[in-house]
Amino acid sequence: MTSPATLKVLNAYLDNPTPTLEEAIEVFTPLTVGEYDDVHIAALLATIRTRGEQFADIAGAAKAFLAAARPFPITGAGLLDSAGTGGDGANTINITTGASLIAASGGVKLVKHGNRSVSSKSGSADVLEALNIPLGLDVDRAVKWFEASNFTFLFAPAYNPAIAHVQPVRQALKFPTIFNTLGPLLSPARPERQIMGVANANHGQLIAEVFRELGRTRALVVHGAGTDEIAVHGTTLVWELKEDGTIEHYTIEPEDLGLGRYTLEDLVGGLGTENAEAMRATFAGTGPDAHRDALAASAGAMFYLNGDVDSLKDGAQKALSLLADGTTQAWLAKHEEIDYSEKESSND
């Protein structure tokens, strides 16, 4: 039951068209510990949806939920995360997930925070599970997997259990809420660098500013021709957070990256098992060119953020080389056989 003091804070927030960051943290913190009744959660989410998500809403909610998250021992410097908001309705192959594996095979330290599908047929967890990459690792074994492979997956519900307090209301509302935007921001690894796709291009600058507030040193926010990916079917809008804290906005075309141009239909995917098979084909060099170039575009951005290359084009070409010479295929063949969820240490 919502306490009188908590209800007072909520009412003040609902009546405030321009809340501060501190006020947002104050109103979202009770939500992380289940202090709101469902009707009050619905009022908060609907109000933010109606007036439009602001910097304070997103940054404040992220800080409140990160404070309540279960910790992960490897954090910050040298880590990169990649995710998208989803909700673009395109139902493409798992581009960002596949690109993350290419980047990890090329030495980028990827701690990917994700979940099962919400708005598409296959979320990152669904396709990784189909690739025999373990999901339900305890913290110690997730660290071991990362140290062995440069990659580990942090299953969002395991590290952000506070989100469960809002799930019934989200499902009942049946419209997008601030939590569609929040998911990619809540990695307990608090990565130094991040690429995030947004289905709503109006959120690009806003998310870049939130990244800066959350301590990211370099980040890319992208919206590709209606999708939450770097597009090989049209123009991609980019907001780049640089190390000096400035945010630069620009556009890129597939040709700028040295890649082909395709249609969105060329990238349509299916269930997690189907997308996993498509990914294996791309890694083996037998998949469609559209799949190869789409994954290379996003992996290239990860190499760029990591400081391995000087441009997005150079990054895409590096990704193509890793696919062409079999590096990524060999990486997957090696590491899908490691399952620390079943491997007992000598101290067990």
Curated annotation (Swiss-Prot):
Keywords: Amino-acid biosynthesis, Aromatic amino acid biosynthesis, Glycosyltransferase, Magnesium, Metal-binding, Transferase, Tryptophan biosynthesis. It is an enzyme of class 2 (transferase). It comes from the Bacteria. Mg(2+) 2 binds at residues 228-229. 5-phospho-alpha-D-ribose 1-diphosphate binds at residues 84, 87-88, 92, 94-97, 112-120, 124. Anthranilate 1 binds at residues 84, 115. One of its GO terms (cellular component) is cytosol. Anthranilate 2 binds at residue 170. InterPro entries: Anthranilate_Pribosyl_Tfrase, Glycosyl_Trfase_fam3, Glycosyl_Trfase_fam3_N_dom, Glycosyl_Trfase_fam3_N_dom_sf, Nuc_phospho_transferase. One of its GO terms (molecular function) is anthranilate phosphoribosyltransferase activity. It holds the Pfam family Glycos_transf_3. Mg(2+) 1 binds at residues 96, 229. Pathway: Amino-acid biosynthesis; L-tryptophan biosynthesis; L-tryptophan from chorismate: step 2/5. It catalyses: N-(5-phospho-beta-D-ribosyl)anthranilate + diphosphate = 5-phospho-alpha-D-ribose 1-diphosphate + anthranilate. Its cofactor is Mg(2+). NCBIfam families: trpD. Belongs to the anthranilate phosphoribosyltransferase family. Catalyzes the transfer of the phosphoribosyl group of 5-phosphorylribose-1-pyrophosphate (PRPP) to anthranilate to yield N-(5'-phosphoribosyl)-anthranilate (PRA). This is Anthranilate phosphoribosyltransferase. It comes from Corynebacterium glutamicum (strain ATCC 13032 / DSM 20300 / JCM 1318 / BCRC 11384 / CCUG 27702 / LMG 3730 / NBRC 12168 / NCIMB 10025 / NRRL B-2784 / 534).
